[in-house]
From Swiss-Prot:
Residues 21-373 are lumenal. Residues 395-408 are cytoplasmic. The gene is Lamp3. InterPro entries: Lamp2-like_luminal, Lysosome-assoc_membr_glycop. Lysosomal membrane glycoprotein which plays a role in the unfolded protein response (UPR) that contributes to protein degradation and cell survival during proteasomal dysfunction. Plays a role in the process of fusion of the lysosome with the autophagosome, thereby modulating the autophagic process. Promotes hepatocellular lipogenesis through activation of the PI3K/Akt pathway. May also play a role in dendritic cell function and in adaptive immunity. The chain crosses the membrane at residues 374-394. Monomer. Interacts with FURIN. Pfam families: Lamp2-like_luminal. This is Lysosome-associated membrane glycoprotein 3. It comes from Rattus norvegicus. Keywords: Adaptive immunity, Cytoplasmic vesicle, Disulfide bond, Endosome, Glycoprotein, Immunity, Lysosome, Membrane, Signal, Transmembrane, Transmembrane helix. It is found in: Cell surface; Lysosome membrane; Cytoplasmic vesicle membrane; Early endosome membrane. It is a single-pass type I membrane protein. Disulfide bonds join 230-267, 331-368. GO terms for biological process: adaptive immune response; establishment of protein localization to organelle; lipid metabolic process; negative regulation of proteasomal protein catabolic process; positive regulation of gene expression; regulation of autophagy; regulation of viral life cycle; response to interferon-alpha.
Amino acid sequence: MPGQTSAVAVLLCLAVILHGYQIREKEFPEARGYLQYTATTTEQITAKPPLPLTNQTSHATLASRSKDDYIQTAAETSTFEDTAHITMKTAIPVTTKSLLPISSTSYTFVRTNNSHMTASSTEDTIGSGSITHLPFPTTRASLAAVNHITGRSTQLGGQTTLPKALFTPSHESTTTQRPTLSTIVSELTPTGKDRSTTSSVPLVPRPTFVTWSSPAKIGTYEVLNGSRLCIKAEMGIALIVQEKGLDSATQRHFNIDPSLTHASGKCGSQNSNLFLNFQGGSVNVTFTKEENLYYVSEVGAYLTISNTEKTYQGKSTMMMFETVVGHSFKCVSEQSIQLSAQLQMKTMNIHLQAFDFEGDSFGIVDECLSDYTVVLPVVGIIVVVLCVVGLGIYKIRQRRQSSAYQRI
């Protein structure tokens, strides 16, 4: 019983206190709470602007207040100089009404001007009607220092929060224009020696000649007529320059590198062309078709030497590498073509075909006579050697047989 009596007494006391609190709320609807917030930010940046700046003056006015709220701030004029320092101190005491817990909000202010600014010691009060008409700062940021200010805002039941942007530029303030794309590119583009770090396309040197002869690399060159082959050639090409001096004539050799050569051409029903272009020169081969035969009718070339900047060119008309249409022509031995008095072209291990193709492969192979002229003497020598060896063996056997008869 005593315990129950104590509990009833406690409940009655709580009811009386709650009833009195509600009566007080009705009589005094304005319950005051105070929040004092001070944010101090110090920023110092030393930078040298890309362009000389004239002396300019900027003012900043702090704005916003709701009912009994007030905000204090101060701003002094700033002078822009060639070498800029920023020292910014801002004290923002804020007093608001609050009955609810306080929440944290982070504010970020960005400045782009390289300036020397000291903010302190003025006070301004703004009516409640101007809060919703606060203009935002027009200053835009590009590669600038950033001040991080952490503030606190309170929310009342059924009321709006204070705006996050509280700074408005005065009519006398000078703002920085928005940087254009060309300005940003010019600032980020390296100048002077830094430009050497940019990548560049390597230049292929012009032909350099040697005084000795060496086998040329075999390359495969094709010309397409739509999706079908028109010309296909596998060969090694060397250009020889003959220079006549006061005492004697010297020859300089240049082998065409297939990896540095671009093949192109023109396909026709009677004439087709193969163009081989490389740094410092080119070669042109013309194929002509007559009835069921085709052949190489013209060869031309030009070449520029890198060290002397001399250009050699020539063209020769002939009828060579003749074969049947649909067949391919092959010649392993070297073939020399005199293009001019000072320019000569040599081909080696050549295998080519023009006009009619079946698929992407060569047709029936027709070999050149020069290959036969090389092979026939070799075959003749081998036959003679075999005959001599056979005669020697025959004589040795006859001698053995004659000695055996004498013993009997």
